[in-house]
Curated annotation (Swiss-Prot):
Protein name, per record: DNA-directed RNA polymerase subunit omega
GO cellular component terms, A-Z: DNA-directed RNA polymerase complex
Catalytic activity: RNA(n) + a ribonucleoside 5'-triphosphate = RNA(n+1) + diphosphate
Keyword Heme included in the entry's annotation: no
Primary gene name: rpoZ
GO MF annotation, one: DNA binding
Function text: Promotes RNA polymerase assembly. Latches the N- and C-terminal regions of the beta' subunit thereby facilitating its interaction with the beta and alpha subunits.
Catalytic EC class: transferase
NCBIfam families the record matches: PRK00392.2-5
Keyword vocabulary terms for this entry: DNA-directed RNA polymerase, Nucleotidyltransferase, Transcription, Transferase
Any one of the GO BP annotations: DNA-templated transcription
Organism the protein comes from: Picosynechococcus sp. (strain ATCC 27264 / PCC 7002 / PR-6)
């Protein structure tokens, strides 16, 4: 039995590419994605929304959304 994921791997790759192109330093953006994934993993340890979507994938999606839609960042 094959599990169906709720995301498209090609879309994830495209979003990751967009993040890399927008960043001035590839290493720094990679570290930022990793830090966000780690933080989200511990923040939502008990509340599991989508067990198929791993924290790094969720971090890439969130960061690319923030890049393309700056109005979603509310401070």
């Amino acid at each position: 039995m094959q599990k169906r994921s709720s995301f498209d791997s090609a879309e994830i790759m495209h979003r990751a590419e967009d993040l890399m192109q927008a960043a001035s330093n590839r290493y720094r953006i990679t570290v930022q994605v990793a830090q966000r994934a780690k933080r989200r993993r511990y923040e939502e340890f008990d509340a599991v929304e989508d067990p198929l979507m791993k924290p790094p994938i969720r971090a890439i999606i969130e960061m690319s959304d923030e890049l393309t839609q700056p109005e979603i960042i509310g401070e």
